[in-house]
Amino acid sequence: MIVLGITETHCATAAVLRDGAIVGCASEERFTRLKNDAGYPRLAVDALLRELSLTPRDIDLVALAGTRAYARDWMNRVLHDADYAREYYGVRLEEPARGLGRRARKLGARLGLAERSRGKFELTERQRLALVTDHLGLERSRIVAYDHHLCHAAAAYYGSPFAGERALVLTNDNAGDGL
């Protein structure tokens, strides 16, 4: 089985697994020359398929890391425009405690007391899947989105000496699905 794994957040990356073993991995930043480039890693996917002599028809499953994705332009603005990032996150670097503004905004949005984060452009599921289907020509049934935190937990579990045994995995993340 050949799986193409994709993450579209900061440092957008694609990896190919063949029968559970990683056979290739590439980050979009290597091709765009933009550190921590975000969004659908089209160039990285193309490079992997070329390097591994694969075609999209060879891919059995595309696994997307996370159930949500954000617009590439917005993600890269947050990552590379310090003034915008400070305003968006509500943080002054010289006053870290002010970062509580972001958490208060998130809680307010969750309770319906405030708007969601200003300027955050979330892609619809249709837009997100179209990036994959239009690029690779794959049908939607071969694309699965996995919860962001489940992906972290799976990486920790399967990369540990406890793989195959009962184990508790705790993830602690600042952002991701549901946060």
Residues covered by each model-derived region:
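Short acidic/glycine-rich loops and adjacent helix/strand connectors
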Residues: 1-179
